[in-house]
Curated annotation (Swiss-Prot):
Stored InterPro entries: ADP-Glc_PPase, ADP_Glu_pyroP_CS, GlgC_bac, GlmU/GlgC-like_hexapep, NTP_transferase_dom, Nucleotide-diphossugar_trans, Trimer_LpxA-like_sf
Entry EC no(s): 2.7.7.27
GO BP, sorted A to Z: glycogen biosynthetic process
Taxonomic superkingdom: Bacteria
The protein's name: Glucose-1-phosphate adenylyltransferase
Pathway the protein takes part in: Glycan biosynthesis; glycogen biosynthesis
Known function: Involved in the biosynthesis of ADP-glucose, a building block required for the elongation reactions to produce glycogen. Catalyzes the reaction between ATP and alpha-D-glucose 1-phosphate (G1P) to produce pyrophosphate and ADP-Glc.
Entry similarity comment: Belongs to the bacterial/plant glucose-1-phosphate adenylyltransferase family.
Name of the gene encoding the protein in the UniProt record: glgC
Entry's Gene Ontology molecular function annotations: ATP binding; glucose-1-phosphate adenylyltransferase activity
Reactions catalysed according to its record: alpha-D-glucose 1-phosphate + ATP + H(+) = ADP-alpha-D-glucose + diphosphate
Originating species: Leifsonia xyli subsp. xyli (strain CTCB07)
Statement: the UniProt record of this protein carries the keyword Methyltransferase: no
Positions bound to alpha-D-glucose 1-phosphate: G164, E181, K182, S199
Length: 414
């Protein structure tokens, strides 16, 4: 990785996640369940751990109870080796105020950097689905001599207003010439007019440069104190920002299908689509890569069970993920992800859907193109995802593409 260098990891996990409502009504965005048994933050932490980072803090703020609990119960490295993953809420060290942005979160936590005295700081978001070897990015950063290196991936021009967009220096393509946060008029890549180079929200900083940058930013009254909107453009203006091409990152166990996969799951539609990427026989993103595992809480649960019901009707699943503790009894599950301890009962059908923990789909109910949060009950004979107008009238969120979302603990009646 960085021979002789001390590396420190910071995960920015204080985001509110308004675009994922109602899934973020009672939890922080990084705590949203994903892929059956995971939380979104598990992907960032797994990548850091697999990259041999051993001192990591998670900066939390918004409705962080379930996130803090997940980190404390799940992520417990060996403390005897000075390894830790610690959840750090806003400490109000610089006054009686909460974090006012991602850069301010680092400023208010600067004591952590003073205590550990790292040479390099890896800063990542907590709400993307991907695999990445940060050791390779750190080596690229050290070789470049940049103060900050930004991981980048190509994205369609139509999505540019969702990302920080990078323009490189033609004479020195490893350097960032311009960085614009969520532009409405992006500059496309010269060699690929339909694409832009987007920031992945992953950064490698020289530690002293990061500390100086967040302090400078704190003195700017017009700043939003945001990493992408303020800190990175400051480095670009100083000629100190480099870019790391994600397609140069080779993760052990990757295949041609899922190599360089990266998903921002900040909207309901992208969250739903990312689940669809998991479930085919040859998935676009492979959860089963043993060489670069995605870690999560080890559930003390029985195996999933797919059985006939009392009348002998078969329980069937097609192209689906079924988590521990779940039971499909005389029901049909297709192109769906079923969370732990969920039940799909006789004659019920769940198609093209994402079902969270402890949901109950009663006999002859139907769920299609829907996301059901924890503890949802779909009563016998009830349906979700059939009539978008009726779903909206019942108070459910329905996206323009027709994905219905049912909030935590809701009882859906016929």
């Amino acid at each position: 990785m960085g021979a002789g260098k001390k590396i420190f990891g910071i995960v920015l996990a204080g985001g509110e996640g308004k675009r994922l409502m109602p899934l973020t009504t009672d939890r922080a965005k990084p705590a949203v369940p994903f892929g059956g048994q995971y939380r979104l933050i598990d992907f960032a932490l797994s990548n850091l751990i697999n990259s041999q980072l051993r001192q990591i803090v998670v900066l939390t703020q918004y409705k962080s109870h379930s996130l803090d609990r997940h980190i404390s119960q799940t992520w417990r490295p060996d403390g005897m080796l000075n390894s830790y993953i610690a959840s750090v809420p806003a400490q109000q060290r610089l006054g009686k105020r909460w974090f006012s942005g991602s850069a301010d979160a680092i400023l208010q936590s600067i004591n952590l950097l003073r205590d550990e005295k790292p040479d390099i700081v890896v800063v990542v978001g907590a709400d993307h689905v991907y695999r990445m070897d940060f050791g390779q990015m750190i080596r690229s950063h050290l070789d470049s001599g940049s103060s900050v290196t930004v991981a980048a991936i190509r994205q369609p021009v139509s999505l540019a207003d969702q990302f920080g967009v990078i323009e490189v220096d033609p004479a020195s393509p490893e350097r960032i010439a311009a960085f614009r946060e969520k532009p409405s008029d992006p500059v496309a890549l010269p060699e690929s007019p339909g694409e832009v180079l987007a920031s992945m929200g992953n950064y490698v900083f020289t530690a002293d440069a990061l500390i100086a940058a967040v302090r400078r930013d704190a003195d700017r009254p017009d700043s939003n104190h945001d990493m992408g909107g303020d800190i990175i453009p400051d480095f670009v203006a100083r000629g100190e920002a480099g870019v790391y091409d994600f397609t140069n990152n080779e993760v052990p166990g990757s295949t041609d299908r899922d190599r360089y996969y990266w998903r921002d799951v900040g909207t309901i539609d992208s969250f739903f689509e990312a689940h669809q990427d998991l479930i085919s026989a040859l998935p676009v993103f492979n959860l089963y890569n043993r060489q670069w595992p995605i870690f999560s809480q080890v559930l003390n649960s029985p195996p999933a069970k797919i059985v006939r019901d009392g009348r002998g009707a078969l329980g069937t699943t097609i192209d689906s993920i079924v988590s521990l503790g779940s039971v499909i009894s005389g029901a049909h599950l297709e192109r769906s992800v079923l969370g732990p301890w969920a039940t799909v009962d006789s004659g019920a059908k769940v198609i093209d859907s994402v079902v969270f923990e402890r949901a109950l789909i009663e006999p002859n109910a139907f769920v299609g193109r829907a996301i059901l949060d924890k503890d949802v009950v779909v009563a016998a004979g009830a349906s979700i995802g059939v009539d978008p107008d009726r779903d909206r009238a019942r108070g459910f969120t329905v996206t323009e593409s027709g994905i219905t979302v049912v909030g935590k603990g809701v009882h859906v009646v016929p």
